[in-house]
Amino acid sequence: MSYHELQHFTLLMTQIGFPRPISIDTFRKPDFFLVAEILHYITTVVAPSNAIAMDIATQEDRVYFITTVVNVLQTTLHLKLDSKKIYAAGPEAVRELRKIVQEVATYIGAAATSTDKGTSSAASVDLTLHSNALCVASSKIVEASTKLLTQLRLHVDDLYQRMQQAMSSQPDAASLSAAVQQRIKNLAAECNTLQEEVTTNKREKAKLEEQITQKKQSITHTMDRLDAIRSTKPPFLAELEALEADLSKLHLEYARKFRSLLFLEGQLRANDVREQQRVIEREKNLRALQENALKEELNNMYGGVDARSSTSHLDDEFVETPMPHVMDMHQPKPVQDFVPSKAAPINTNAEIPDDESYSYSYEEEEEEEQVISSANPMQQARAPETHSNGEKHRGLDELSHKSNENADNEEYSYEYSDIGGEELDPDNIEF
């Protein structure tokens, strides 16, 4: 903003009748209150119907005031204004205000010229009515001015005469000495006061230095205590280390038992699968024994005639229908798929047995196979037909009862082994 623009702005403000005097150096620093006052005055002049309250206490109020005033002036004067520059209230805001003031000055000048033509006669009438009062006031002003001038002349003349008398007269030694003594006393009093101030300052300085030393000593003492606290080992730290050691031991024990539990669960599932397979095989063998016994019984009842192997009934003229085959009369039921049962919970506190106790024996299986093979009528020679059916059923029941007793009394033992045949340690199993 140039000096010429500032001067022109101040002149325009006086021209539109702004009540507050504005200097050229007013806008060297931001003054938001002055800018708000100028905008409020301009809005009252241009748009008196749009009464805007000058509330600029907070930042939100200032922003609202600037935006509303700028919108009113833009719609009224048809100007393009920058609200950010006006809100800054600096030298850049003077250019925006200068645009507004120029339009307002032209507006006021046009309104004044239009009103002067219609009110010239009324103004002359008003002056004639107050002519006597104006004459009295002018006479009073003239009298007061003459009195003031005469008093000033008398005062100046008296002062000049006094100065001439003082310069021409001889000074009195007593009065001079008295004045000098008085001046000396005044200076001595001033020196005493200064000396007292110096002593008080020294005393205060000593007190401050003493306080500073005390603070330094307290700081050093606290630092020593802090170093001692840092150097000493607190008692709870040893307890914490002991608890950490116990926790590590418990964690190792938990990990070992967890690995053992997983291994035993796997062994239990494998044992359940083997047991189910044994039960299925045993049921198959019993079913085969029953079928063979039934077949033998039927063959004995019908005289050993087999519809598929023998064709003598075709040549027999007395046989009307062929005899049904034994296997067609009794078909075996289909075996259902095996579904392993859910593993039972394991006691984790139980000790894991040694490797020596895990040994699998095949003697009982061999005995069972021998019993089944000995009881199978297909592999042995046919019994004589004189045996009764009651004896055959009794032998079949004894075989089934014996096989069930063997299954109940079986004790299974397994060895820990990997796929390659190597023994496994339950504590060193990796999952």
Curated annotation (Swiss-Prot):
Biased composition (Basic and acidic residues): 384-405
Composition bias, Acidic residues: 352-370, 420-431
Ranges in a coiled coil: 177-218
Domain of life: Eukaryota
Gene Ontology terms describing biological process: cilium assembly; intraciliary anterograde transport; intraciliary transport involved in cilium assembly
Family: Belongs to the CLUAP1 family.
Disordered, as annotated region: 346-431
Keyword terms of this UniProt record: Cell projection, Cilium, Cilium biogenesis/degradation, Coiled coil, Cytoplasm, Cytoskeleton, Flagellum
The protein's role, per its UniProt record: Component of the intraflagellar transport complex B (IFT-B) involved in flagellar assembly.
CC terms in the record's Gene Ontology section: 9+2 motile cilium; axoneme; ciliary basal body; ciliary pocket collar; ciliary tip; cilium; intraciliary transport particle B; microtubule organizing center
Matches recorded under Pfam families: Cluap1
Protein's cellular compartments: Cell projection, Cilium, Flagellum; Cytoplasm, Cytoskeleton, Flagellum axoneme; Cytoplasm, Cytoskeleton, Flagellum basal body
Protein name: Intraflagellar transport protein 38
Annotated InterPro entries: Clusterin-associated_protein-1
